[in-house]
Amino acid sequence: QYGCTLNMSIRSLQQGEVNFTVTGDTYVVDNTTLHPGDQVTVFYDGNAPAPLIYPPQYKAVVIALSAYHQYYLGEFYNNFVSTDGTLQLNGMAAQGTFLPNGQIFSGALVGKTALVEYTSSTRSIPAQTTPDRVIVFCYS
């Protein structure tokens, strides 16, 4: 469908140049319009098929402007430690916990994919942070 996708090329500090396909299914935090030169964090499904080409090309799942915030996308155990053991949430999000459509989320994070927005974290393992905002994706 012509016009329904956006091809985006970014220069990553870790991976060099990377191409992303942005579709109507891509969640863009705060529905922000992206511009050339924006500092972004892009999450993609590492288990999804991808062509073996250079530069690598992935389908973007979540995109966030990241000039002032850091982001983590993943699942959490009931002790608020991420399932990969890299991040621990201390306390509730300052701005709240929401669904992608902006409605308040009142359930438990366990077993759900969550996008955590934060400004600082400790250098411990796992890193600890008090999130600014949490967006919970309830997949069926």
Give the role of each language-model region.
Residues 1-9, 29-89, 101-140:
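Short, flexible, surface-exposed loop segments at domain boundaries
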Residues 16-32, 95-103:
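A cross-kingdom feature marking solvent-exposed beta-strand/loop segments within repeated
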